[in-house]
Each structure stands twice: as structure tokens, then as C-alpha cells.
């Protein structure tokens, strides 16, 4: 597809008082790059880089709204420390840098506010805490509600003082979401019962926001169409709520999605086991009834061609991307220029983005090593040629070796890459053979296109030895060894590095043995999930499909990774 064939994706759209240059929005996500609640240079440049890459609207997150929002507090700070404490006026100088930087590239920006029920100690009703079942929420009093609204107002004022173009109201968890949920909100006053009553706090939140931002700025709202919990937020009620918000344009644009950050996380942060655009069933229901404000679709819309088709078919007005723009913030510009093969793919693995976030660490990307390094000279267009051209030899054609070769060549070096196998890819070739993991080969496929363009000479089917390197003429100035790793047959016994007893037996195999068909498996198999990622579950699926009775053992109360796992029931 040429750039001219994008008839909709790069057309302007009206959002509130603004005309936005295209239909690509950065979906709000918390990169956890703050420090003591303040935006760092890492955070500032990370966000500006999205505008530099061509996105029309950069929506940022996570902004806690009250000192009592301490649910994520950890001994080392964790989530709470690294998210933004939006009630502090001290955020304004850093936020102004972001707003100025985003505007420099012709984009607009907003910030998403997120209140966690006054420190997750209080909620709509007296029910067990949704994250800590041994704790009970206290019902929020009218004074508590006033406190929440007062802090929300202060946060809006701070964001507006920094020159942002809008405020977003989060609704995939938090206080407004819980008040909307019939399974959580058991109140009998004006904030409980009917949908209109359960939506009252949301409407008051929007009213407070509008009083601060006025008509010259925009308000966005994240509508949970289906939170996938029994008796909670369901599509029928979400449609009614959307109509209420559409009337009189109470908000200026509306994200539509499914899932809850905690209880239905596998749908909220959909991994590659879920189809691209898997949330569109929810988005389309809202698009049918909302007539006055733009609808924003989310949920693994990871390809500009897919985004174009969704808009062309009238299923949405705008597409929001988070992980695809982490993997390649230049996706919008590259698509507009018709350079689709140059777009670095998001593989939907969730390994360094979602998992790092859930661990309370700044996010990174398994496909893009520059994430979080933009302030150190690794932003878009910042790479400089080396002062001295060198002869570089890279040994190993897996993802790491391919990336080292690509970057070295782009910096002007003479690069030759050697791989002993006939095919490039290393362990990624096995990863993409696992059930549902076909996208795991995406990075290597992209690298295979990029290396020749960068001028890398590739030699496959050649095992490199030290003698071979010593005899090279001319001798290399630099040798990069990227030979990867292989599965340990002796494994780990659990919480220590002690070997598994009996690993020398003939019936003990590695995942590679199974994937490559080298393992002789009988009718029963036991899998030891020492790594605690998706591998054990995927191997179990392979064996079960062959009629094998499988049992998985793990050192923790669950198998696999909570951040990558699909429904294993």
C-alpha cells in the first residue's frame, strides 16, 4: 500500500476545539518513568518521542490524584513512586517541557487521571478489597466524595497550567469504575441503585473537569464496555452510559474497550494469543449509538493497514495504540511515507512492557532496545555516525546479534555477521513454533529486511572459531559475540540453582527437544516450570494435542506468567 492509499488514517479530525492532524492516538499507559511522583527527563523524552514519530494525539498516564492513592506502594517505591503524583504543583515545569515538545511536532497532548478509591481503603460499599480479599473496603462518605472531587480539580488545574490540551478520565478500574459496577456498588443513596445514580460520581467528575478546562480544551473518557466480571459493567449498560455522555457532548472523545486492570487483566493487556483488534465487538456497539463525539478504538490495533480498514469501514473514528508505538514510535511517519516494511513490529509478548510495569519497573520493549533511553541520545533521528569507521564482526544471528549488526552498520561501520545455522533467527525460530506464538518471529523477520538495507554482510552456515577470527585479513577491530543460550537439561530445583535430581535420565528433555521433535514422549509427561513463563504451558499444549497426559509442577502457586498467560482452563 502506498502512502496515497491511506485515505482515512492521515486525514484530520476534530476533537473538541482542536483539529488533530491524523487519526492515530497514543493510548494512555504508565511507563513508570517518574521519580517520587515527578516527571523525569526519561519520562519527558519518552513522551515527546511519540509526537516526533508522527502520532496526532499523545495521551499520557498514569496520574494519581490523591496522596491516599497508595494501593501500589511497595517498600522500594514501585508503581506509586514511579507514576505521576498529579496533585503536586511541582509536576508543572516537567509537564510544560512535554507539552512544548509535543506541540513542536504538530501533535496534541492530554493526561489521564486515575483515582484508586482513596488509597484503596474505601469504595462504594463495604465489600472485600478486589485485590486483597482479607481486607474490607469502607463505604465512601459524602465527605470522602468531596475530597476525591477536590483533589481531582487540583490535578486538572496543574495539568492545564502546564499547557496540555486535555484531561482524560480513567475507567478501567478506580473509583468511578467501582461506582458504576452493580456488583461492587451496593449503595442505597443517590450514588447507588439505578445506572443514573451509579454514574452520578462520574458525571460530577466530568463537571469538575469541565469547570477547570473550559471549552477551549478537551476531555476524554475511557468507557469500559464490558469488564468481563459477573453482574458488573455489561455492554447494555455501557451503551446507555455512552448515550448519556454523548448528549450535550459531556466529553470530547471516548475510548472504548473491555476488561479491568486487575481481575480481567488478560483481556485488558491482550497478548498475542488474542486476535488483532479483539476489542472491536465492544467498540462497534458504542459507535452505533454515539453521534456527536469521536470514538477511539483500542486493543491490539498493531498494524496501520488494520487501522485504516477499521476507520474506512466506519467502525471507529480514531485508533489508539500503546504497545505498537512502544515497539516503533515512528509507525505513523513510516506508514504515511509508505515504508510499511520498515515498521518494527510489536509481537504482543508483554514481556518487557506489561511485565515490567506490573513489577513496578520502568517499561522496556523486547523489540526496541531504545525505549527509556530517548533522553540519552537514542530518540528518533538522534543516532550519530561513529567518529572512526571500524571493521566489526558479529558472531551469532539471533535477535541480539542481528540488532547489534544493524545498529553498528547504521553508525557507519563495516559489519559482517556470521551464523552457524543456515537460517537467521536463533531461539526466535523455536519461539514462533509454539502454539499461538507465531508473532514471536516478527522481530527477526523485520531485522532480515533491515540488515541488507543497512549494508550488513551476512554469512550463514558458518561456525566461527577463535582461530578463524585471528586469521581474518584485515583483522576486525571489534568482535561482538552474540551466540545466545540453550536450555539447561539439569534445570533448577525451584527457588535455588540446585540441579533437579535425576536430570541425567534418558526420559528428561528440554523444551527445544519437544519443539524440534527430538523428544521421545510416552503417554504421560511431567513438566517442571522452573522458568515461570509461557514456555511450560505451550509445551503442555503441544504434548496434550498429541494425546499425552500432562502434569505441570511449579515453584509458585501458579504456572506460567500472569502477564503473558492465556486461559489455561
Model-found features: residue ranges?
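Short acidic (Asp/Glu) and glycine-rich catalytic loops that position anionic groups and cofactors
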Residues: 220-224, 263-264, 425-428, 457, ...
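N-terminal Rossmann-like dinucleotide/flavin-binding domain of flavoprotein oxidoreductases
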Residues: 426-476, 563-569
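Flavin-dependent oxidoreductase catalytic cores
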Residues: 1-395, 399, 403-410, 414-415, ...
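Glycine-rich phosphate/diphosphate-binding loops that line cofactor/substrate pockets in enzymes
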Residues: 20, 210-219, 453, 470-475, ...
